[in-house]
From Swiss-Prot:
It holds the Pfam family ClpB_D2-small. Keywords: ATP-binding, Chaperone, Metal-binding, Nucleotide-binding, Zinc. This is ATP-dependent Clp protease ATP-binding subunit ClpX. Component of the ClpX-ClpP complex. Forms a hexameric ring that, in the presence of ATP, binds to fourteen ClpP subunits assembled into a disk-like structure with a central cavity, resembling the structure of eukaryotic proteasomes. One of its GO terms (cellular component) is HslUV protease complex.
Amino acid sequence: MARIGDGGDLLKCSFCGKSQKQVKKLIAGPGVYICDECIDLCNEIIEEELAESSEVKLDELPKPAEIREFLENYVIGQDAAKRTLAVAVYNHYKRIQAGDKGRDSRGETVELTKSNILMLGPTGCGKTYLAQTLAKMLNVPFAIADATALTEAGYVGEDVENILLKLIQAADYDVKRAETGIIYIDEVDKIARKSENPSITRDVSGEGVQQALLKILEGTQASVPPQGGRKHPHQEFIQIDTTNVLFIVAGAFAGLEKIISDRTGHRGIGFGAEVRSKAEIDTTDHFADVMPEDLIKFGLIPEFIGRLPVVASVTNLDKESLVKILSEPKNALVKQYIRLFEMDGVELEFTQDALEAIADQAILRGTGARGLRAIMEEVLLPVMYDIPSRDDVARVVVTADTVNDNVLPTIVPRKPQRPERRDKSA
């Protein structure tokens, strides 16, 4: 591009018709000219179109039943949690489309407030995966933060604003898009108050963090350091409004079930105890009857609980669910390993009793679905080491003995190819 300097006023912008003297700059192309004012206008139009495309359109927003159906393809079990999340997410993005306000039947403006989500349940039962799958479906920025790394401002550790930086980074620094994203804060039970009564000494990683999270959970204009770390007065900040950011806060809350049973009167020991099998106890939704006062007794402050009105709970996965997780979802572990072996030209087969044995091992270890991959790696490591160096293996079969007794998987050799017969008449 050539830039036109001083000269006559015969040169005009090909778009608005203004002469060179009427504008600050006129830039020339092959037979055309464009002025600085038209360039600014083009930039504004492009920015508006990009902002519109990054928003979740209401007519495209899936209904709660569709959200739940999508989750079914990836997450096994946890039906109650799926329903709760589907409704909460649908209402949240419907509220964003309404611009935080809606009109009732009398034509009065009604302000629609945000409903963040609290997820309760044991480790390895799908809390994080549910949130990740939701974000994938809605095509919105998603960030995971660990509450245990957070401390109150002014102390060693991460500020709560660093959570927002992760979301901005997930949106490729598009702040407008980040403002409609989802933040998942894990291990929130670890920032519970150390005692039920407020302490005289400062609890910088417990109650202090809860206090620091209040504003961003509710919705505020936050100043985020672009490089992370601590704030200092001489640096520039990224401004982000958290009013439309959906927060999903989760934790295992070990010990909360005892607080609930003490309140409801369900005795676990003694002559009046309910007699239940171990399987029933393991798959019971311990948190179905949770009330705000139980969470306060556990160590969450009332203001923090008040900003998490939607409560979803997940249960321990039983053997049947773990077997389904191994083989049924779209990206099931068995399908992943079959694909890995296919890349080496080898078939991989798991017998049904092998899948059940892997599920039993995960239950014994108490790691839930998260432990399935570790068990699969242990079982398949010897053959995954040998097979790339061999060309005589057709199929690998994993049985229950492979899992339980540390026996090598059965290797089925490739049939030798017969040499082609030559025609004697040739």
